[in-house]
Amino acid sequence: GSVRIFSSLMDIMSDEELLGVIGHEVGHVAHKDSKNGFRTALLTSALKDGISSQGGKAAALTESQLGDLGEALVNATYSQKQEREADDYGYEFLKKAGKNPWAMALSFQKLKQLQEEAGAQKSSKLNQLFSTHPDLDARIKRMEERATGEGIEKPENKAPEAAR
């Protein structure tokens, strides 16, 4: 697979924070999340088609918005689990590189700031991107608790230019 990072992140994140984001994305590749997600979507669609071919009330439900909602829930839950695993991968990626894993929480804080700046524009690319991701506050808290629990000191939050 390939990893893509928005170049604008380089303007707001330190090298360690960017490395954490890259580690997160590498985690998706290492865990074959795209392949597994595609397989889940195909199986869910096939199951839905199989039920609807039988006719009756079950078919009516699978063809309705309720069926679409069920399919979305299956895929969203899977996606949230993948995101947590990719977050953990990014955290470990930083540690293995000899970097401070607090960078995961700090990168999420900056992403949250970007999301807040996008505001109520539900159609913004950023809000669309994060609509399938776990809540950033929960992700920040989880990474902070992990680093604190491991006795890792939080670095001073430097401007990206000063950090390079």
List the predicted regions and their residue ranges.
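A Zn2+-metalloprotease active-site environment signal
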Residues: 1-164
